[in-house]
């Protein structure tokens, strides 16, 4: 059975994007599989492509307790990048738990992968666990798109997700760093963050973020607050139109009063007013003789 990475992110020609040819399958199997070895923990480094940036210490402690009781059932997966130097491909939480237990060595499977393959496996392995924050997931999608030169639609097909899911996650990356940090720290939810996107103005986004955290606003309250701000930001055209109409009335009344004063002085003045869509027209006839 072909492994998920080979099937979804193979490096063959376009006809084999989703499945590698049978001839190359055995080579891939030989390439990615080695027997389990005990590797000194001091010789192992975390994966530089690890999408997870926040590790819950309490959960690592729980995992360490489980490993102490039952042993490490699933070895970590690493690749060798220098003599006696290894990089984690999958299993960083297990590695951290083993470190907390004071282990000197940890069981590991060594796979011979290049940088692109290592990054892809690490990203996909974490995405499949569905334990990433929304921002970590978005970063993982972005890295896969860049590594394999994919469109959002192509990535969605390979991961079995809707394109809108990918697009919504990637939009989060355009938010200010403070909001992304709040998402990572789980101070706000993904829906809170997505509600902030229409504001556009970074200063306003951060102001609302502060309100969400300080007032513990739920998603509905946040959306209502943002809708109000967006409404307030709209040009007040109606008010402007009323101001223009008022000025026009003042002008018309001033002209009428002036004509009335001329008439009262004994001069017979004829005037005619016409109203059009865009303007008023006043025609005044003043006799040359009384």
UniProtKB/Swiss-Prot annotation:
Keywords attached to this entry: Cell cycle, Cell division, Cytoplasm, DNA-binding, Septation
Top-level division of the source organism's lineage: Bacteria
GO biological process, alphabetically ordered: chromosome segregation; division septum assembly; positive regulation of sporulation resulting in formation of a cellular spore
Location (main, coarse): cytoplasm
Subcellular location: Cytoplasm, Nucleoid
GO molecular function, one term: DNA binding
One Pfam family, short name: ParBc
Position of the signal peptide: none
Residue ranges of the annotated DNA-binding region, renumbered to this chain: 153-172
GO CC field: chromosome; cytoplasm; nucleoid
Stated role: Effects nucleoid occlusion by binding relatively nonspecifically to DNA and preventing the assembly of the division machinery in the vicinity of the nucleoid, especially under conditions that disturb the cell cycle. It helps to coordinate cell division and chromosome segregation by preventing the formation of the Z ring through the nucleoid, which would cause chromosome breakage.
Record-stated family: Belongs to the ParB family.
Name of the protein described by the UniProt record: Nucleoid occlusion protein
């Amino acid at each position: 059975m072909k492994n998920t990475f080979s099937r979804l992110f193979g490096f063959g020609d376009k006809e084999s994007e989703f499945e590698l040819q049978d001839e190359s399958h055995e080579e891939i199997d030989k390439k990615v599989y080695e027997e389990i070895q005990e590797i000194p923990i001091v010789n192992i480094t975390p994966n530089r492509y690890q999408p997870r940036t926040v590790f819950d210490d309490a959960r690592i402690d729980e995992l360490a307790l489980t490993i102490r009781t039952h042993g490490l059932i699933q070895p970590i997966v690493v690749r060798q990048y220098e003599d006696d130097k290894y990089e984690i491909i999958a299993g960083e939480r297990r590695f951290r738990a083993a470190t907390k237990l004071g282990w000197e060595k940890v069981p590991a499977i060594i796979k011979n992968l290049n940088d692109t393959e290592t990054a892809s496996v690490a990203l996909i392995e974490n995405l499949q666990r569905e334990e990433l924050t929304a921002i970590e997931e978005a970063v993982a999608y972005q890295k896969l798109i860049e590594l394999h030169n994919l469109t959002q639609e192509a990535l969605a097909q390979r991961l079995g997700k809707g394109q809108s899911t990918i697009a919504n996650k990637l939009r989060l990356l355009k938010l200010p760093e403070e909001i992304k940090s709040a998402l990572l720290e789980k101070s706000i939810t993904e829906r809170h963050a997505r509600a902030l996107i229409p504001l556009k103005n970074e200063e306003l986004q951060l102001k609302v973020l502060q309100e969400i955290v300080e007032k513990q606003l739920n998603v509905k309250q946040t959306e209502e607050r943002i809708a109000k701000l967006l409404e307030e930001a709209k040009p007040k055209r109606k008010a402007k139109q009323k101001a223009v109409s008022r000025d026009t009335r003042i002008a018309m009344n001033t002209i009428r009063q002036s004509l009335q004063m001329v008439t009262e002085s004994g001069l017979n003045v004829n005037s005619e007013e016409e109203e059009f869509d865009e303007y008023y027209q006043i025609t005044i006839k003043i006799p040359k003789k009384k």
